[in-house]
Amino acid sequence: MSHTLQHPQPPAQTPAAAHPVSAPNPQKRLIAAFGILAIVLIGLNLRAGISSASALYHDLQLVVGYGAFTAALLPSIPTLCFAIAGAATSWLVRRVGVEKAIAIALVTLTAGLALRAVPSVGMLLLGTIVSMSGLAVCNVAMPSFIREHYAHKTAAMTGVYTITMSLGATISAAVSVPLAMQLDSPSLGLAAWAILSVVTLLAFIPIALAAHRRPAAAPSPATSPWKLLKTRQGLLITAFFTIQAIAAYSIISWLPLILIDGGLDPATAGLMLGLAQVVTVVTNIGLLALASRPGGLRLAFMLASGSYLLGAVALLTLPAPAAVAPALLLGFGFGVFALVLVVISKSGSTTADATAMSTVAQSVGYLLGTMGPFGLGLAHSLSGGWTLPLILLVGVAAAQVVLAWLLTATKRDGVSRDRGGRNTGATTAVPLAEGSPA
């Protein structure tokens, strides 16, 4: 009898004991909430330092007084730093973990932005290099951070991240000129964005402190970053990331100046770049929703890439006062960045795989992506106008459309399938170790 009375006891306590196991849940929920806040704030930072400078290049050149070479070099520094510092991110993540790597990056970003307050060519260049190096680490580490902490919400969290990234670019492009006028200094207008990075760092500190002190596992030889370039899927992802970086940063760097030279005032030209980013915020939601549907990944990639091509043609053929049309089309086209980030985040079967893919795609992509802003600036200096640079940009946009088709063609309908050909329901890339198309 005492046996029968004690028999129900363990089952009754097992469920009860299951709840104490999740007793740290409130703390985990708090850290998860801080994580979402950090994703939002980091997203706001990632383009603010670039778009604010883009809107102020005209005023900076007048006040600081740099020549044509520096004018062509400055817009190329972000992509160059994204390539070089981005390549070191995989090593840094292995050494200290993804959370601490991001915390270090935010400190670096803040220091670099603050340096740009000094109105001299040397401090402008140094501050840009330091701040963009911090952004580079965030760029590469964030897909891994999202995968590690929000594995079942990768697409949704990537959407939040890219939407806030676009918002940061929109706000900074729109308010940088008025802010600089208010502060009576384009250098102070640039440095003011250090306030946002300080707030982000403060929000991220609890996450870094709560992180386990274990270094992230090194990628296996099959997913070692540079070996991914020998796989078809790794090569296609890297090639596409490269072409979209060339296309996007060419516009982010030069659109205001193109429109100013066409007759628009600096404030309106900055607003056009802001408008493009607003459109990106809205279209990102639709593109990510479309990409998550069976067969929708290819359509989303083609819509975004095709829109960018039309925007580049419109910018070439329409007068500056009609800038709203190309701004809308280019803004829609920027949405392809969110799509390729989702593909990177879901690449392979582990966080280490995603970090490896993110490292190689962003390092190579941004290194070659420097050809965009620098090439357009050089073509403008040599030709004395924007016709030749914009013809080159149309060619880049056409190449992006072709690569979008090839990338999504690695799956018959953009939907991941298992070995038996069954739909797994995920719009992901082939596991990277396979290295072959489906």
Q: What is the role of each PLM region?
A:
Residues 129-163:
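Cytoplasmic helix-loop-helix junction between adjacent transmembrane helices
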Residues 121, 152-153, 159-209:
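Helix-loop-helix hairpin linking two adjacent transmembrane segments in secondary transporters
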Residues 348-386, 393:
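A late C-terminal transmembrane helix in Major Facilitator Superfamily
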Residues 84-122:
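Conserved MFS/SLC helix-loop-helix module at the cytosolic interface between two early adjacent transmembrane helices
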Residues 18-29, 209-237, 425-428:
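Juxtamembrane intracellular "pre-TM" segments in multi-pass secondary transporters
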Residues 297-340:
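C-terminal transmembrane helical hairpin of 12-TM major facilitator-type secondary transporters
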Residues 53-54, 232-281:
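Extracytoplasmic gate region of multi-pass secondary transporters
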Residues 85-97, 283-296:
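Helix-to-loop junctions at the C-terminal end of transmembrane segments
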